[in-house]
């Protein structure tokens, strides 16, 4: 089988196409969550805790300076505000995926059917077998 034919069969399998659709939808959902966190949730939390803009939170390790040649040396800063926003985005996405998986599992995990009771013929044959063992 040629390489191209094998690749075509691989791509045309249902699981690969489902995965591709899931990746595209996931990317779009990620953008929605990013906008939700950056434009709605973070500003609301910021207002509640005293007008803080979470995306601008940072820790300055070394202030900006001007060197002997007159050039500005930028500050060394750890911008943890964006990191906090990213953690919040992750939590929202993980929770949404958890809910979706939980619903899918609920739909697909149906109660197993009770085992069938053996027919009269089978019961009679078992009785004969058991009596012959004695």
Swiss-Prot record:
Keyword Glycoprotein applies: no
Record-linked PROSITE patterns: MSCL (PS01327)
Subcellular location as annotated: Cell inner membrane
TM helices/strands, residue ranges: 16-36, 81-101
Superkingdom, taxonomy of origin: Bacteria
Family: Belongs to the MscL family.
Name under which the protein is recorded: Large-conductance mechanosensitive channel
